[in-house]
């Protein structure tokens, strides 16, 4: 029995203690780092967000894939910002529920072509999520009702 426990202990030392995850599910640090960087990435954008005056119509699909800037910057004072844009067409079905008609059409959307980390505007510190309580100058309580 002691030999078995010794063998198990040596095996754990060689392979590492099991973490409860299946091998292969842990993404390596460098991949996490590169995939989280500020860059263009496919993003689903709701059509009504880009065309808010079109609320009288339904669209199929209701959102479209476009490249948009996203990701993390090395400093909280920076934000991932588009430095290049162009227009792309996406074929959409526009449904008019009042007339009971639908038609295929091409709608234009802004797509980001380049991104970089730039200083946030003064009113945009922490993307509106400042963790400091402005009255006390200290961190905001996580559970203000406790």
Swiss-Prot record:
It is found in: Secreted. Homodimer; disulfide-linked. Interacts with VEGF receptor-1 (FLT1) with a high affinity, whereas it binds to VEGF receptor-2 (KDR) with a low affinity. Does not bind VEGF receptor-3 (FLT4). Gene3D superfamilies: Cystine-knot cytokines. Residues 118-139 have a biased composition (Basic and acidic residues). One of its GO terms (molecular function) is chemoattractant activity. Keywords: Disulfide bond, Growth factor, Pyrrolidone carboxylic acid, Secreted, Signal, Toxin. Residues 118-146 are annotated as: Disordered. Snake venom VEGFs may contribute to venom dispersion and prey subjugation by inducing vascular permeability and hypotension. This protein strongly increases vascular permeability, and weakly stimulates angiogenesis. Interacts with VEGF receptor-1 (FLT1) with a high affinity, whereas it binds to VEGF receptor-2 (KDR) with a low affinity. Stimulates autophosphorylation of VEGF receptor-1 (VEGFR-1/FLT1), and VEGF receptor-2 (VEGFR-2/KDR). The modification Pyrrolidone carboxylic acid is found at residue 25. One of its GO terms (biological process) is positive regulation of angiogenesis. Its main location: secreted. The keyword Signal applies. InterPro entries: Cystine-knot_cytokine, PD_growth_factor_CS, PDGF/VEGF_dom, PDGF/VEGF_growth_factor. It comes from Protobothrops flavoviridis. One of its GO terms (cellular component) is membrane. This is Snake venom vascular endothelial growth factor toxin TfsvVEGF. Expressed by the venom gland. SUPFAM superfamilies: Cystine-knot cytokines. It holds the Pfam family PDGF.
């Amino acid at each position: 029995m002691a030999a078995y426990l010794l063998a198990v202990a040596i095996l754990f030392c060689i392979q590492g203690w099991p973490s409860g995850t299946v091998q292969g599910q842990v993404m390596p640090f460098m991949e996490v780092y590169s995939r989280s960087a500020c860059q263009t990435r496919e993003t689903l954008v709701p059509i009504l967000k880009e065309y808010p005056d079109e609320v009288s119509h339904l669209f199929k699909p209701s959102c479209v894939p476009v490249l948009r800037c996203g990701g993390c910057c090395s400093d909280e004072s920076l934000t991932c910002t588009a430095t290049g844009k162009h227009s792309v067409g996406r074929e959409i079905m526009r449904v008019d529920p009042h007339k009971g008609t639908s038609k295929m059409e091409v709608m234009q959307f802004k797509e980001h072509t380049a991104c970089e980390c730039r200083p946030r505007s003064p009113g945009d510190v922490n993307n509106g999520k400042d963790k400091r309580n402005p009255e006390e100058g200290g961190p905001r309580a996580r559970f203000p009702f406790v």
